[in-house]
A protein has these predicted regions:
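Intrinsically disordered, low-complexity acidic/polar segments
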Residues: 25-27, 59, 73, 108
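An amphipathic, aromatic/His-enriched active-site/gating alpha helix that lines ligand/cofactor pockets
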Residues: 35-48, 67-103
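Short, well-ordered beta-strand segments in beta-rich or mixed alpha/beta enzyme
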Residues: 11-19, 49-80
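Short, flexible segments with low predicted structural confidence
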Residues: 4, 12-13, 29, 45-47
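Short, surface-exposed ligand-recognition loops at beta-strand->loop->(often short) alpha-helix junctions
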Residues: 19-32
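Generic alpha-helical hydrophobic packing signal
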Residues: 13-17, 31, 101-103
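Glycine-rich beta-strand-turn "strand-cap" elements at beta-sheet edges
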Residues: 1-10, 52-60, 85-119
Length: 119
């Protein structure tokens, strides 16, 4: 009798690059934070990380790293009323997005990468 392997836990990370003009991407991220929207998203079940970054070289792009425990948690976030608040702020600040999506690679032996990490 063959047994099915246990389901793999595949966390999801979405990198969203917000692009705008005249500082609009940065103002968008600042208002997301000041309005409490960022804290509310971080409190959603399954959220692992929701954090904005600004490039050292400046420019008109802000990076959001948005990580979730699994697809169900991300789907619940997308179905939440939070999305209309986010969409309204995107519209208000006239930002555009480029999106990259990553799924955890549990099959890879991360120990092999440790030699390159300074802790």
């Amino acid at each position: 009798m063959s047994r099915e392997p246990p389901p793999r836990h595949l966390s999801i990370t979405v990198n969203i690059y917000y692009h705008g003009a005249d500082g609009s991407a940065r103002r968008f991220a600042e208002e997301m934070t000041a309005s409490g929207t960022v804290d509310a998203i971080r409190a959603e079940p399954g959220n692992l990380r929701y954090e904005y970054f600004v490039p050292l070289a400046g420019g008109e792009t802000v990076l959001l790293i948005d990580s979730w425990e699994d697809q169900q948690a991300l789907d619940a976030h997308h179905a939440s009323p939070m999305m209309s608040a986010i969409a309204a702020l995107r519209e208000k600040h006239d930002v555009r997005m480029t999106v990259e999506r990553y799924v955890t690679d549990e099959a890879h032996d991360a120990a092999a990468d440790r030699a390159f990490v300074r802790e």
